[in-house]
Curated annotation (Swiss-Prot):
Residues 52-70, 127-129, 176-189 are lumenal. There is a cross-link at residue 215 (Glycyl cysteine thioester (Cys-Gly) (interchain with G-Cter in ubiquitin)). This is Insulin-induced gene 2 protein. Keywords: Cholesterol metabolism, Endoplasmic reticulum, Lipid metabolism, Lipid-binding, Membrane, Oxidation, Phosphoprotein, Steroid metabolism, Sterol metabolism, Thioester bond, Transmembrane, Transmembrane helix, Ubl conjugation. Residues 1-28, 89-103, 149-153, 208-225 are cytoplasmic. InterPro entries: INSIG_fam (IPR025929). Binds oxysterols in a pocket within their transmembrane domains and interacts with SCAP via transmembrane domains 3 and 4. The KxHxx motif mediates association with the coatomer complex. One of its GO terms (cellular component) is endoplasmic reticulum. GO terms for biological process: cellular response to insulin stimulus; cholesterol biosynthetic process; cranial suture morphogenesis; inner ear morphogenesis; middle ear morphogenesis; negative regulation of fatty acid biosynthetic process; negative regulation of steroid biosynthetic process; roof of mouth development. It comes from Sus scrofa (Pig). It is found in: Endoplasmic reticulum membrane. GO terms for molecular function: oxysterol binding; protein sequestering activity. A motif (KxHxx) lies at residues 219-225. The keyword NAD does not apply.
Length: 225
C-alpha cells in the first residue's frame, strides 16, 4: 500500500447494548404477532365449538356461520392473547420468580388441548343445572392451572383476567352488542369466568415458552460474539 493512501473506515458497528435492545424489541414484536394469530385461530375454533352444538359433521351452514358472526371477535381475542402472553413472562421477571415448571412445547400443546376440551365441555355436556356445570368447569380450570402452571403469579393473573373479561362481556351484552341463549349470571353464562381463567393460563404458558426460546437464542448469540 502506498504511503499517501489512507485506509477507508469499515462499516460502523453498534455497541453490544444497542444490539441487545434492538434484538429484544424485534423478538418482542415477533412474539406479539405469533400470540395474536394463535389467539385469532383459537377464537375461530372455539366459536365453531359453541355454534355446532349437537353437530358431529361440518355442514355448509355451520362453516358459513363462523364467517357471518361478528368480525371483531377474533381480532379482539388475538389482541388480548398477545397482551396476556407478553404479560406473563414480564411479571415473572419483575417478581424475580422465573417460571420453570414443565417448560417444554409438548406440555404447552397439552395445555391447549385441555383448554379446548374445557370449552367443548361447556357446549356439549348436559348437566341438571348450570351450577353443576359451572362448578365442574371451575374444577377443570383450576386443575389446568395446577397441572401446567402452579405459580402464584399465574393464578393471580388468571383470576384478574377472568374478572376483567367477564365484566367487559357483561357490558357488551348489556349494550346489545350480542347475547347468550340462556343467560343465568348477569346477562351471561355462569361458566364464562372459568373459560376466561383457563384461557389466560393457556396463553400465559404459550407466552412463557416463546420468551424462554427467545432467551436461549439471545444467550447463544452473545456466547458466539
Amino acid at each position: 500500500m502506498a504511503e499517501g493512501e489512507t485506509k477507508s473506515p469499515g462499516p460502523k458497528k453498534c455497541g453490544p447494548y444497542i444490539s441487545s435492545v434492538t434484538s429484544q424489541s424485534v423478538n418482542l414484536m415477533i412474539r406479539g404477532v405469533v400470540l395474536f394469530f394463535i389467539g385469532v385461530f383459537l377464537a375461530l375454533v372455539l366459536n365453531l365449538l359453541q355454534i355446532q352444538r349437537n353437530v358431529t359433521l361440518f355442514p355448509p351452514d355451520v362453516i358459513a356461520s363462523i364467517f357471518s358472526s361478528a368480525w371483531w371477535v377474533p381480532p379482539c381475542c388475538g389482541t388480548a392473547s398477545a397482551v396476556i402472553g407478553l404479560l406473563y413472562p414480564c411479571i415473572d421477571r419483575h417478581l424475580g420468580e422465573p417460571h420453570k415448571f414443565k417448560r417444554e412445547w409438548s406440555s404447552v400443546m397439552r395445555c391447549v388441548a385441555v383448554f379446548v376440551g374445557i370449552n367443548h365441555a361447556s357446549a356439549k355436556v348436559d348437566f341438571d343445572n348450570n351450577i353443576q356445570l359451572s362448578l365442574t368447569l371451575a374444577a377443570l380450570s383450576i386443575g389446568l392451572w395446577w397441572t401446567f402452571d402452579r405459580s402464584r403469579s399465574g393464578f393471580g393473573l388468571g383470576v384478574g383476567i377472568a374478572f376483567l373479561a367477564t365484566l367487559v362481556t357483561q357490558l357488551l351484552v348489556y349494550n346489545g352488542v350480542y347475547q347468550y341463549t340462556s343467560p343465568d349470571f348477569l346477562y351471561v353464562r355462569s361458566w364464562l369466568p372459568c373459560i376466561f381463567f383457563a384461557g389466560g393460563i393457556t396463553m400465559g404458558n404459550i407466552g412463557r415458552q416463546l420468551a424462554m426460546y427467545e432467551c436461549k437464542v439471545i444467550a447463544e448469540k452473545s456466547h458466539q460474539e
